[in-house]
Amino acid sequence: MWERRGRGESAAGTAAVASRNASGLRPPPAILPTSMCQPPGIMQFEESQLGAQAPRATQPPDLRPMETFLTGEPKALGTVQILIGLIHLGFGSVLLMVRRGHLGMLFIEGGVPFWGGACFIISGSLSVAAERNHTSCLLKSSLGTNILSAMAAFAGTAILLMDFGVTNWDVGRGYLAVLTIFTILEFFIAVIATHFGCQATRAQTNASVIFLPNAFGTDFNIPSPAVSPPPAYDNVAYMPKESSE
């Protein structure tokens, strides 16, 4: 009788534990796949086999800096810079050949139309290349050469204005006037290209990267609940009473 009662209590405890498992434990929530779209500038971690988290190898590029750079029409500005550089090289060569002993032209003696024209051509070519190939290296190279072109145009304008005061050669003054107009134009073009290049570089530097842990878990094992120990029994044997005859 005691053995039957102990077995009944053990079965009732097991049924109670099973009912708690059925009502208390919930299935894991649905997890979205990692192939869903992510906004630019977000890098997601993946868990390796050893449990360590490692970032993905690729990151979506941020196109906002390049859009800022393209607002300034770098291809058109670069084309004009190349033409101005060619004009400087051509007019400088003509002045060098026909000056006929007219000394005192610092613009020619210092080779301003040659190194200035070469600088204008290089900066214009890099601006056109940066619009065709959207790379950070070309963007920074275009920015650096445009800064140099602006400095060269400013120095060339100052030298041309100085030559106007010391040159009495009428033909030379005509060439200097044309070169002054194109040099001032190159200065403003280089400043505009530098402005948009600085904005694009600043936007590229300030682009934030957000690190998100991987949404997948590697262990879906549900811990088994603790089973209560069976009840204690007294060491008393039940002896049925013999029936009297």
UniProtKB/Swiss-Prot annotation:
Domain of life: Eukaryota
Localization of this protein: Membrane
Membrane topology: Multi-pass membrane protein
Disordered: annotated span: 1-30
Residue stretches spanning the membrane: 78-98, 103-123, 147-167, 176-196
InterPro entries: CD20-like, MS4A
Family recorded in the similarity comment: Belongs to the MS4A family.
Function in brief: May be involved in signal transduction as a component of a multimeric receptor complex.
Protein name: Membrane-spanning 4-domains subfamily A member 15
